[in-house]
Amino acid sequence: MDRDEFAASIDHTVLGPETTWGDVETILNEAADHGMNACIPPCYLPEAADYENAPKTIATVVGFPHGQHAPGVKRDEAVTAWDDGADEIDLVINVGRLKAGEDDAVAAEISDVVAAVPVPVKVIIETALLSDDEKRRACEAAVEADADMVKTSTGFADGGATIRDVELMSEYLPVKASGGVGSYEEATAMLDAGAVRIGASSGVAIVEGHPGDGD
């Protein structure tokens, strides 16, 4: 994978509760300058939409970080995010519903968001909290709901992306590996395992580790 293609697979991310507009500006500038995407909190989308040095793709999160919003709230949050300029939506499932065996409710919630916005929806299943069977069922719900991608983690649970989880999830949909990916080597390992996108707060270091960076 050449340097530009590799950079375009990175979602350079800032989503902490203490995130300021200044932090978002830094992420936008770094993403644009290095050819990455950006993933930012929804409250900063209006400013980001008007920002001069913005990357081509700006993603945001819905139902973040625990996924326990009411379904209608998630749908409305997604619509607002799209209206405010989001190019992609990263949606957190209700893990409790999944663990209780309410897979139809999980799929319906995802479907509501997918139907409400004309942009790609990535479904965050929070792998660190799930058994392998639950991971498979979460991916099946995402497939049933016509989601575009499944994503490993929010970064707020213990544990992040693993090679094993990426391999499992990629049997169902394209995968975004997120959580604990901090170097070029780690990102490449995830891509080799089947991921098509990487979410990371250390996107600059990851891209600068590519052998073709600076050519």
Swiss-Prot record:
Pfam families: DeoC. The active site is at 90 (proton donor/acceptor), 151 (schiff-base intermediate with acetaldehyde), 176 (proton donor/acceptor). Its main location: cytoplasm. GO terms for biological process: 2-deoxyribose 1-phosphate catabolic process; carbohydrate catabolic process; deoxyribonucleotide catabolic process. It is an enzyme of class 4 (lyase). Belongs to the DeoC/FbaB aldolase family. DeoC type 1 subfamily. HAMAP family: DeoC_type1. GO terms for cellular component: cytoplasm. This is Deoxyribose-phosphate aldolase. It catalyses: 2-deoxy-D-ribose 5-phosphate = D-glyceraldehyde 3-phosphate + acetaldehyde. Catalyzes a reversible aldol reaction between acetaldehyde and D-glyceraldehyde 3-phosphate to generate 2-deoxy-D-ribose 5-phosphate. GO terms for molecular function: deoxyribose-phosphate aldolase activity. It comes from the Archaea. It is found in: Cytoplasm. Its EC number is 4.1.2.4. Pathway: Carbohydrate degradation; 2-deoxy-D-ribose 1-phosphate degradation; D-glyceraldehyde 3-phosphate and acetaldehyde from 2-deoxy-alpha-D-ribose 1-phosphate: step 2/2. Keywords: Cytoplasm, Lyase, Schiff base.
